């Protein structure tokens, strides 16, 4: 399966998603590794077998083995961190002063350019709705030279991939 197959699988009422998916696959404000990794990390965060398979088939070959592992790691570690830090942020109190005591070594040595890993972490954090994580990752990527347009492109990819996954999974449940 490919991006084209995903587009063709979308129902007529999701035509905007189809158009967005096509234009984002050709987005040129991000470099190839940034774009491919954002698509893959977002697909994994969206938890759809169909979407993840199609996006991995389309974008996996564009990444080195190390970059592919890092995109997967961004989705995995943010799956944990987004829950933990969203709790800390929303509940408040003294939780922020306690050590997390969760291993996060991959964040220090992701195996790719740190800014790319942070961008993928930002996209996943947007999908998972962790404000504290989004603020932190956005600050890091901006301090390391990414533009607002590049950040926005990654979030547009995350939003569209997530919506495609929800739509296709919903349609599958209805059939």
Swiss-Prot record:
It comes from Granulibacter bethesdensis (strain ATCC BAA-1260 / CGDNIH1). Keywords: Antioxidant, Disulfide bond, Oxidoreductase, Peroxidase, Redox-active center. GO terms for biological process: cell redox homeostasis; response to oxidative stress. GO terms for molecular function: alkyl hydroperoxide reductase activity; disulfide oxidoreductase activity; hydroperoxide reductase activity; peroxiredoxin activity. Belongs to the AhpD family. NCBIfam families: ahpD, ahpD_dom. It comes from the Bacteria. This is Alkyl hydroperoxide reductase AhpD. Its EC number is 1.11.1.28. The lineage of its organism: Bacteria, Pseudomonadati, Pseudomonadota, Alphaproteobacteria, Acetobacterales. The gene is ahpD.
């Amino acid at each position: 399966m490919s991006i084209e197959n995903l587009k063709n699988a979308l129902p007529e009422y999701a035509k905007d998603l189809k158009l967005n998916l096509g234009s984002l696959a050709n987005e040129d404000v991000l470099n190839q590794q940034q774009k491919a990794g954002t698509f893959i990390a977002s697909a994994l965060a969206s938890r759809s077998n169909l979407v993840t398979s199609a996006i991995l088939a389309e974008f996996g070959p564009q990444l080195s083995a190390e970059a592919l592992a890092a995109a997967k790691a961004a989705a995995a570690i943010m799956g944990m961190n987004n829950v933990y830090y969203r709790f800390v942020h929303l509940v408040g109190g003294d939780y922020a002063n306690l050590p997390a005591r969760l291993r996060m070594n991959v964040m220090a040595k992701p195996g790719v350019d740190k800014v790319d890993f942070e961008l993928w972490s930002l996209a996943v954090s947007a999908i998972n709705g962790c404000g504290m994580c989004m603020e932190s990752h956005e600050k890091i990527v901006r301090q390391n030279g990414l533009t607002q347009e590049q950040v926005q492109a990654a979030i547009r990819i995350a939003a569209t991939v997530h919506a495609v996954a929800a739509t296709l999974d919903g349609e599958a449940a209805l059939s």
